[in-house]
Design a protein with these regions (language model features):
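Core catalytic alpha/beta fold that binds nucleotide/phospho-ligands
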Residues: 1-198
Length: 198
């Protein structure tokens, strides 16, 4: 890559519903891997119980992760219970997908080879930075150390997760919850210039 100072640029993009997210890192001191995912809560299966829906994902989530999703409501028969359980499903899916994207592997990657411990509360627009990941068989390609996560709501209908892995020893968390800058399409294009056609 030329120029040389751009060799360590790492970025990732995700889109769903009304949002497009771009995360990046331009640190020159180390190799940083980033991944992001966003999900639209409105994209929900109609008329299906959460147990029926989630049974198709038993190979992707651990028993502990599934239990977290199912604990979303006190009365599992209430319609709001299924909605809240699906919101937790999308939250966990965003976390899994953000790691897969940071690693640069496809969704055929074994999603059960790692699992998350997340705060047992519902997401808000206030970022959660205390999510922890356990890698069951760490390797040079998939270390357990150096991961940081940020997850929150972008609005009432969309959640996101960002995964960052750095190889800097003792770096600690690299996000503090202030990383998200929201731009509408007009702000994004205000300084745009047409690409010269040849």
């Amino acid at each position: 890559v030329q120029p040389a100072h751009l060799r360590n640029v790492s970025f990732n993009i995700s889109h769903h519903g009304d949002w497009v997210l771009l995360v990046g890192d331009t640190s020159l001191e180390s190799t940083v891997r980033v991944g992001v995912d966003v999900m639209d809560f409105q994209d929900q299966p109609a008329g299906e119980s959460f147990d029926t829906f989630s049974s198709g994902f038993l190979e992707q989530f651990s028993a502990r992760e599934m239990a977290f999703m199912k604990r979303a409501a006190a009365d599992p028969a209430a319609p709001v219970a299924t909605r809240n359980q699906l919101r937790r499903f999308y939250r966990m899916w965003c976390l899994k997908e953000s790691v897969v994207k940071a690693l640069g592997v496809g969704l055929d990657f074994n999603l059960k080879s790692f699992e998350f411990t997340v705060p047992d509360v519902e997401q808000t627009i206030q970022p959660t930075l205390t999510t922890v990941m356990q890698v069951h068989e760490p390797s040079a390609d998939f270390p357990e150390e150096g991961w940081s996560f940020e997850e929150a709501l972008l609005d009432p209908d969309h959640c996101y997760a960002i995964a960052v892995q750095t190889e800097m020893e003792g770096a600690g968390p690299v996000m503090d919850g202030s990383e998200i800058t929201k731009l509408d399409w007009q702000e994004l294009l205000q300084d745009a210039v047409p690409y010269p056609v040849q």
